Each structure stands twice: as C-alpha cells, then as structure tokens.
Amino acid sequence: MRGILEAAIYVPRWRLETANISETWGQSTAKGIDEKAVPAADEDTLTMAIEAVERLFSNSTADRNDVDHVAVATTTPPLAESDLVAKLRTATGLPANVRTATLTQHTASGAEALATAIDRDGLSLVVCSDCPVGIPATTDHPLGAGAAAMLIGEDARTAVSSVGWYSLDAPGIRFRTADSVQSLGITNYERETIITAVTAAMENTTTDRSIDYAVLHQPNGTLPYRIARSVSIDTEKLTHGIVSRTIGDVGTATVAIGLLKALSEATTGEDTLAVFYGGGTAAAFNCTGSLNVSGLLDFDETESLTYATYLRQRGYLGTEQITGGGANVSLPTWQRSLDSRYRLVAGRCPLCDSISFPPDGACQTCHERVSFEHVPAEREGTIVAASVIGHGGAPPEFTTYQQRSGRYAAVIVELPVGDQSVRVPAQLTDIDTDEVAIEIGDTVRSTIRRIYEQEGVVRYGVKFTPNMKNRQTD
C-alpha cells in the first residue's frame, strides 16, 4: 500500500514567546500558543523547504534520482509569480525531468499535495513549507514558520489507507488580499464552519473514533481540542500532534509537521488521523504505522528573541532600499554557477587530479584549461578565516539583510573533497555575533539561504551554520 516512506521536518531555531507579544500590545491573539518559530532574516519558504528535503535524503536509503514527482505546498511563496519547485529541484539535485506541482492559495494545499502523491504511481516528494505574515498588532501574533518533507511510495512504513474530502464556501475565514493574513474575526462563525468541514471530511473516510493519535487543524493551540470534543475524539490522543503550542500557526505546514511528530511516537499497527483545513476545504487522512523522522531536535534546540529583534528580523520595521551592488554578479553568470552555489559542486582536473572550486576556467593547480569532472564537496567543514561585518561595512546589496539581522560574519570554510579539500567564501547564519565567539577551527555545515535581492530577483546560495558546540557565549 502507498504511504509515507521517509520524512523530515525543519523548524527555524529562533523563538518568540507569546508573553513578549502580550507585554508589547497589551493582549495577544495567539490563543493556546506559548511561543512561535521565527524565520531568520535570510530564510523563506524555499530555503526551509530545501533544508527539510536535504535532511530527508541525508538520512534515507532512497535515491533522489528515482523521484519522478515533486509537489510543494505553501501559502507564502517568495514571489507571487515564479516556479518555486524549479528552484527547489535545482538546489537539491533532483532530476531535471521530474514532474512538478506548486499548490497554494489556502492552508489545506498540503493535503492536496499529499493526496496527489498517494493517488499516483512512482516515487513522489511532497513538501509543505510556510511562514505566513500578518498585521503586527493582531493577526501576526500566532504566525510561525517551518517545513515538512515526505517521500511517498509503495510498501510504506506508514500506509495511507483512506482519504476523505469536504468543501464549502467559507467567506471571511483566513484570507489574504496581498501581503498578510487577514480574517474577519467572527469567532463562532469561523469555529462552526471549520468544525462542520472537518467532521464531514472525517465521515468521508473509513476512520472510526478508536484511532490512537489525532492531528487536527490547529491555527492556534485551543481549536483542535474544540474540534476533538465535537467529534467525540479523546483529547489525550492529540498530545503528540499539537505543534502550534511551540512553533505557532505554520499555515499549510502545521498539520504536516504535527502528523510527522505523531508518527514518530506511534508504533507498528497504530492508527493516526490527520485533518487539514483551509479556505473552506477539509481533508482527512487515515495513516497506519510508525516513522523515523529527521529534524525533531528542532523542537528543543531553540534561541529566544526580544520583540524588537523579532520585528526587525521579520522585516516589519522599515528597511532602506539601496541601489547598486559592489558584489554584483550578472544573472546569466549566476545561473551557470548554480550547481556550485547550491550544492558545492567542485571540479577534478583530468590532467593533475587536483580539485578546483568553482569548476570553471583553468585548473587552479596546473593552470591548464580543462573540462572538469564534477565532484561534490562535503557539507560540513572548518572555518579557516573569519571577519565580522558591522553596519556600513557591507556591499550595498547586503544592506537590507544587515538591517534585519544585525552584524554578520563572513568566513572562509575548508571543505573535504575526497582526500583533498577546497576553500569557499561565504556568510555564517543562525548566529548572534554579539553573543557567540567565532573561532578558527570551528566546524560548520552548509545550508541554502537568501543571499541578496536585486531588481526584484532573490539570489539564493550556500551559507554556513555553526554546530551547536560553537554556540556558547563568552
């Protein structure tokens, strides 16, 4: 039976406590949420999706070259019109001829992506990634960030035995006209509409109330309990799948992350119900089995933000737009070097067997112009040089990032390539340079982040994150 073969999650390490929101605004709309996950200044739905996918394959026996279908669900793509999946495919090294689908518009789009993968043949990759934004004084309070990646195929450890759907027109319940989530806030109407749709979707599956775990639509930490009581599900069965309490409302990814967390607690033969809702559509999935899920440590390895830092990091405070660029690279040149910028692909010289990075032009050892054999560098390396860039010290295209993140570190990282190595210049991310000392010899790991935006085009590429042992304060 088809189902989930492998899975991984990614949740940004930064957290904002609801108490800080209440202290600032005198109240909070984040009901039942203790804290929420906050994307770094250089993160968005694409970078989080990439990280979840890389975690999946780094702990999987599956070959990414066998994937023939990729579906990504989000309510907040980086651009209103662009192919998010094409960027994901390139960055993660999936086959160029893979069939792609981007699903958006509402928070149940993750259910559409999962159902499509279940219904088809072959090996499918489903990714739910979101970081919704709202009005800071009201609708933003519960909104978090995160991503889930699932590999779908035959003979799965977690079988999806039944899927049920229900839809109705639900005007005024969570909509977005431009850049931020809105709702008319008619609480009883919203709650009753959601419960009606969720109940009907459950009735359209073979699920009964004797399930072992339930993961229900959770835009906050209280609604899933109301839904459970209304459909006679023991609220104890929600325990492992309630993630909104600690990462917030993650749009289309909330239930997906909650489902994977619940499946990691389940044992063989146990049943887990997952119910998505969004825009008037509800979908219920009956899953049987357990799953090893990569990335669950993200729930524990966290760092707190002040509310002022949160507003700056999310871009809610005004940032200055700078023209020009001291480190500008033309788009054609950037495109030609994507394999190196995304996947750290180096080149082996056929004449002297030495490694060059990037694999372009003349060999950096024998200086002959050759056609390099492409070989990937390791994702983990060592800092051999570092410098902290303060305000006013960055090239113009990094000004907006620096305004949101504060001081940042530029490093040179030595990465193994077989029995040789290459040195790569890059930025460090997910580190407060005012609190954490950067030392030569520290180990770091590559990740994909936003590098800068120019003329409306976001340039993505490799940055490095420190290992946890390097996050010690002086």
Question: Predicted regions: what is each one?
Answer:
Residues E439, T447-D474:
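OB-fold/S1-family single-stranded nucleic acid-binding modules
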Residues T323-T382:
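Cys/His-rich short segments
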Residues P77, N97, T102-G122, D140, ...:
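Claisen-condensing/thiolase-fold acyl-transfer catalytic domains that form or cleave C-C bonds
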Residues T45-T61, R191-T207, G258, A262:
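Short, well-ordered amphipathic alpha-helical segments that serve as non-catalytic structural scaffolds
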Residues T45-Q105, D208-S230:
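Conserved beta-ketoacyl condensing-enzyme motif
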Residues D430-R445:
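Short nucleic-acid-contacting surface segments enriched for D/E, G, S/T with interspersed K/R
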Residues E380-D432:
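Glycine-rich active-site loops that engage anionic ligands at enzyme catalytic sites
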Residues M1-E43, D140-E192, T267, Y277, ...:
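Condensing-enzyme catalytic core mediating Claisen C-C bond formation in acyl metabolism
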